[in-house]
Structure formats: structure tokens, C-alpha cells
Amino acid sequence: PVFAHGSEAHMVPLDKTLQEFGADVQWDDYAQMFTLIKDGAYVKVKPGAKTAIVNGKSLDLPVPVVMKEGKAWVSDTFINDVFQSGLDQTFQVEKRPHPLNSLSAAEISEAVTIVKAAPEFQPNTRFTEISLHEPDKAAVWAFALQGTPVDAPRTADVVMLDGKHVIEAVVDLQNKKILSWTPIKGAHGMVLLDDFVSVQNIINTSSEFAEVLKKHGITDPGKVVTTPLTVGFFDGKDGLQQDARLLKVVSYLDTGDGNYWAHPIENLVAVVDLEAKKIIKIEEGPVIPVPMEPRPYDGRDRNAPAVKPLEITEPEGKNYTITGDTIHWQNWDFHLRLNSRVGPILSTVTYNDNGTKRQVMYEGSLGGMIVPYGDPDVGWYFKAYLDSGDYGMGTLTSPIVRGKDAPSNAVLLDETIADYTGKPTTIPGAVAIFERYAGPEYKHLEMGKPNVSTERRELVVRWISTVGNYDYIFDWVFHDNGTIGIDAGATGIEAVKGVLAKTMHDPSAKEDTRYGTLIDHNIVGTTHQHIYNFRLDLDVDGENNTLVAMDPEVKPNTAGGPRTSTMQVNQYTIDSEQKAAQKFDPGTIRLLSNT
């Protein structure tokens, strides 16, 4: 038996206990040592040793790790002894809550209770967004810069959907009252998660749709997977009522290969009325056979190459701290919260410039997205998804997998938002925070002198949202040189169109690829764009900022000499939204500075 404090210790298996706790467990056979990683804690411990190394510092163990029949055992107090030792300083207790902290689960529930008690509230009402109603901007900056408390009650914005009618309310959580209740005219509400379920049920139980499926060789509607899509705006030319709550449904066949996206049921669109809970119209084109070639994407048909482990270690702990929802790294401080529509919102971003805390950005987030497709055919012409506004990209946050979606040294943050019933829902691993090496920051070698090089470090805030077939990855990247970058991209699966052509030598290939590219037998990837828009409320050294355009130009040389051309910069101020509406050109520069 093993004893602790004079009595027999209760031992539990190390692997199972630590993995259930959420820690990564690694065994070094050469060093005969365990490495345990959990959030900001990096622990090394040898079997039989009376000490462990936690973030580079020694910690006495009341009970050592014991090996028995080839398995490691630890005391049932091991997790508390090691991970609650205080040696991991990544997470700090927030003594003064930031005024932009997300609504807690309790606050979300309180907002729903208050709203449901209103006489205007209808039983069938659903919730599209419940979020913080932001206090006065000047007061928030005063808190961030001087620590001045914000003298305002916590307030919530509640957006609801009563049938097809959108309602916006503002709720005082402290005094438990509704400050405003505003029906929004001429607006469509977001597509909610239960709408997906409703559409699938409507399709599965429709005898009319089942008959149409037979034209495509499908006799079992239960194998049809639906994707509910917004109908777009065509000013009545599509024969649809713009004020109705409608979705267009394109379908795919589940063939059992785990990738129904590769099996589109082409030229078949069902128009579903969400209020009437029925199909009101079926739009068809020429029948195209469903591509049936198995195309799994989970690796079942591949032999992955054997690779040796790649480990990222921080043996002395993190270089950043997280206090509540505020993150501090080197000279940067910023607040982070998750919004159900736009995802992460970074606020009160400051940079410590030799002891002076300088304002950089009050708030930054994704503003919206649009994904327009360029194919005019019946199943494609209406596709121009507003992923953020129509579907809620924060709601569709994809939990991040450490070691795959983010490096193994990442800290994963859970976030809480409201679902369509108003119930608080926690998304595990919603945001990843990690530091990485990013090459040389500076290098110069002067002849006859020693080399001068400095390392570049970056702090990354990563978030992933899965909207249908696409998985969007967004990185906010903080550089130690005072730069903030945004990297946006997509992975997932291409949205494809079923066609007759198997190769580009087939008779129909030219027409089949008019609006896309043949990427597999009978499958075309249609031409489309992903356009990201970001909302950046920059306050560089204050709110009196000016946006300046700097356009490089080649001009004739008028200064004399043999050179015929020069490179100059045309600089001008952008002082209106009309001037700001410009075509994207990566060769131009936009400078925002304090004036």
C-alpha cells in the first residue's frame, strides 16, 4: 500500500484519470517520465519520485506515481495537488469584471424569464440572439485605461422570432424590466437550428416529393439529406412572396460512404413554407443521374503515411495570462467574447508602449459574409449565402480539437450562448489561444560584424465555424511588433453540381463546365466567391482618426536624367462612405492614424 499523511492513499489509474480530466498524457520511454499537459500547466513526473516539475518549478508530491503491473497509478488527490498548486499562472481571478463580459448562463436565463413575462410575448416565439447590450463606449474605455467602474446595470439585447415577425427587446437584468420592445418591419429572421429539423421532416413525409425522387432513381426518401437555404431576393421574378418565411431545399443522397455532399440530386429544388410546414413548390430541370462513385473524406479509403510525433512544449508555462475574458500577452491587452451571429468580438485592445497604455481598437469582429455562386441553373441561381446574418456563425461554432485544429500547446476556451429556446448552451473548445514561433522578426549580417537576429512571436486567437459544407477558420494574430493581422480561410467540402460529363472529352463537357470546373466524374465545382467583411472600430490613440489611401503609381520622370519612369504614392483622405466604396486591390495601402 501507498501512504499519504499517515493513512493509506486511494490510488486511481493515471491514464484514465488524467484523460477524463482533459489532460494530454505522454510517456517518454527513454527518460522514463510522464509529461502531462492541461491548458497552461506543463507537468513532468517520474514514477516513484517525490517531486514533480510544474511549469519549470519543483512541487512536492504527497503521494508519488506508482507503477504496478505495467500501469501507472496516482493518488485520487493528484489532480488537485498538481493542477491546483498555484504554479500555473495562465488563468487569473478577475477581481473587477470587464463591462463587456459575455452574458453568463444565469444572465441569459434571467433575460428569457423577463421577456417571457411580457404581455407581448407569444408562446411560439423563438430566440435568434441573446447578447450583451453594450454600455457607453467612453465609460468602457475609462474602465480599460484607468480602471474606472462602469456605473450602469447589466443589460441584454434579445432578438426574437414570432412566426415570421422579428422583435428586438432590451432588458435591464439588474432591475428585471424591459426597457424597449420593438417589432422590426420588413425584415426576415435568421434560420434557426430547429428549422433544419423541420425541413428534413417535411421532405421525408412529402408524398409529392417522393414521387419526384423516383425520376432520379431514388425510392427511399429516408436516404435523402436536405440542406435548407435562403431564397434570395429577385423582386418577384422567381414567383415567390418576399414576405413569407420560405427556404429552398436542395438534396443529396446518403449512399453510405460518409460523404453525401458527393452525391447531389441535381436540378431538384423544393420550396418549403416554414409557417405552413409544407412544400409549396417543386422546381425541376432535366434529370441528371446522381453521381454514385464512393467519395469518403474520413480517410477510410487511404493509407496514411506514418509520421513521427511533433511536440510543442512550453516547459515554464505560458507567456500570456487570461483574467476572466481579458487576455494579456507581452505588450498587448484585449477582451474576448463570443457572439452567436459574428463569432469572436475583440474589444478594448491596447498596446503598452514603454509604459504608456495606448488605445488601438475599441472593437473588432467579423461583420458579415457573403458567398455568391455564378451558376444560373435552377438549383444554383438563388445561392448567395449571408452565412453570418442568415445562419449565425457563432451558433455554428465548431469545437476545436487540440493537436489537429490548433497546436497541442493551445488553451481552449469554452463559451456560452443561448439556443433558439433561450436555454444557455456551452460550446466546448469554442476558441483556441496559442503562441507560436513565426520566423525571424529582424535579421542583418554586416560584413566583418556578428549576425544580429531576433525571433518573431505571435499570439493567435483561433475560431472555427461550420456552415453546411464549409468550415471557416479565422485567426486574429497579434505580433510583438505592434501589428494585428486577420487570417480568414475555409476548409471542409466543395459544394458540387451533378453533371453528365465524366471527362472533358465527353460531348456535354463544355456546357457542363460553363459555370465551373470538372473535378471528378460527373461532378463540377461551381464558380463562386467567399467575401469576408470585418467591422473594425479603430481608436488609434483616441477617436479622432483619419483614413488615408496610399496608392502606388508609376509616373513619367519629369526631374531630368536618363530614367524615364518613377514610382510615386498618390495619397488622399477617405472622408465618406462613398469614397470608401472601392474595388479590392491588394496593391494599395490604407492607413488609419490619429489626427
Spans of model-derived segments:
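Short, structured motif recognition centered on aromatic/hydrophobic residues
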Residues: V12-T17, W73-V74, I79, A111, ...
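Post-signal-peptide, soluble extracytosolic/periplasmic N-terminal scaffold domains
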Residues: Q26, M33-G40, I53-G56, E94-I218
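A short, sequence-level motif marking secondary-structure junctions
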Residues: K46-A52, P62-K68, D172-K177, I203, ...
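Beta-strand/loop-rich accessory regions of lumenal/periplasmic or secreted enzymes
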Residues: K137, G189-T595
